[in-house]
C-alpha cells in the first residue's frame, strides 16, 4: 500500500512537471501570438520595445510584472533589449523622447526610467520640460550639462532613430515588442495566470521569434 501510494505520487509529480514544461515550450503561432510585418527599415534592432512614460501598461511591464527583466535574463550576452520612446503620446512626448536619448547617452537610463515613470504616473509632479531636467538633477547631472547633451550629435541621432522607427514600423500602441524587424508580438495572447507566468511566456516567445529563420 505504501509503495502504491509512492508510485501514484511519483506519477502525479511527473505529470505536473510535464504540464508545466508544455506550457513554456508551446508552438507559438503567427496570427495569434505574433504578426508578421513587412517593414522597410534597414538593419532593424534584433529586439525593440516601443514605450511611453505616459503608458500605464509600460510602467507595469518595467516595474511590476517585470517583463523587461524576464526578457533580459534570457537573452544571449551579445544581445540587448532596445527601448525606444514614442513621441506622439502625451503633451511632453517629444521632450520625454529627448530625455530618454540623453539618459541612454549618459548611461543613466536604468535610473531615469523609474524616476520618469513615477513622476508622471505616481507623484504626478512632472508637468513641464523643466521638471524633466530636474529628474536628471537628482542624479547629479546639472541643467547646464543636460543642455549640452541636448545638442550632442549622437543624442540627436538617437532621437531621430526612435521617431523614424515608430513611423516606419507603424507603431500604434504601447508597449509594443518587435523582433528582427519582422515580428510584432501580440501581448494579449500570452498566459494570464499571474505576473511571473506572463513575464516568462513573453520571454519564451521572444526567444522563439529570435530563433526563427529570417
Where are these regions (language model features)?
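N-terminal secretory signal peptides that target proteins for export/translocation
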Residues: 1-6
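Bacterial N-terminal signal peptides
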Residues: 9-19
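Sec/Tat signal peptide C-region and signal peptidase I cleavage site
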Residues: 19-26
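A short beta-strand-turn-helix
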Residues: 28-46
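Structural cue for short, hydrophobic secondary-structure segments
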Residues: 49-51
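Structural alpha/beta surface segment adjacent to cysteine/selenocysteine redox centers
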Residues: 53, 59-130, 201, 207
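A structural motif
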Residues: 104-111, 135-142, 179
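C-terminal cap of thioredoxin/glutaredoxin-like
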Residues: 139-214
